[in-house]
Amino acid sequence: MNLNFMPLLHAYNHASIDFHFNSSTRDFCVHEVPLYEFSNTGEHAVIQVRKSGLSTLEMLHIFSQILGVKIAELGYAGLKDKNALTTQFISLPKKYAPLLEKNTHNLQERNLKILSLNYHHNKIKLGHLKGNRFFMRFKKMTPLNAQKTKQVLEQITQFGMPNYFGSQRFGKFNDNHKEGLKILQNKTKFAHQKLNAFLISSYQSYLFNALLSKRLEISKIISDFSVKENLEFFKQKNLSVNSNTLKALKNQAHPFKILEGDVMCHYPYGKFFDALELGKESERFLKKEAVPTGLLDGKKALYAKNLSLEIEKEFQHNLLNSHAKTLGSRRFFWVFAENVTSQYIKEKAQFELGFYLPKGSYASALLKEIKHEEGENNDEF
């Protein structure tokens, strides 16, 4: 497979919308929503931290330096953007809590502010969040483009959006996935196992994005062309589909088509299950009750079946499903932005947007769907 970045397809068909977005502490804010309420008792202090111009890992090093706590003792649910104003929850052993107030000034000098202190019986672990609330400010926005943006947001609110991994996943030079493949091929290796695992996961992410874009292409072809033309397309791709199946797929109201053999998942969290009655599952998809999933290949990955598997096979890799430490999983192909709010400030030519996304989903994917710029990984995160 070609490992160079190819343009990823958009869900909707509007022309590109011109505006400026700068990922900065003024124009981009991220607020973590915790997975559970904290009990206010237990051996772990839980602090809500606001950081500015720092990555999560840089923040952890600062806490370690100032408080004397080992980085391994600090718990966090996920990585937050460096070029943003962000809040997230950090856990640390209770004995360090008295040092927080004493070091308020030292922390503020390093662009960190403690917003709240609580306690809980367990350490926060990766993935212990529901999702994130986002705020974005777009600049140099004309009234016409503001109207177009609102129309796109209406579509996204109704039908959702592709759950692409954001460009942050692939590094400054868009080559993390290439390094991940080299690790699998035993062509390179780094001293830190976490770095090796992250780079391999970047390769998984690259394959997922490519699979999702391919599925979008197939969905658009099903919607836009006749059954006869579709039969010819699938025949050329050596995919076995009959005319009755194609008619049923064209009748699905959602722009992203659920195929025979898809692995579904209850939304926003729940168990995986096979799509058996496609019409029924498409209706549940429209109601935001269940969503089709895509492959993150690995040793214990759950694979699709039938037509969905025929397409998925192109994006599997034997080195991933034989790698002992790469277990694999599945990821929502599609997500739904919630609590979407927007306002256009005409005199400033600015458009302000707020929304919520579930964990693992990227604001840059929503920006990409709105802006429709040509090329890949040109978002400004």
Predicted regions located by residue number:
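Non-catalytic, substrate/partner-engaging modules appended to enzymatic cores
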Residues: 1-381
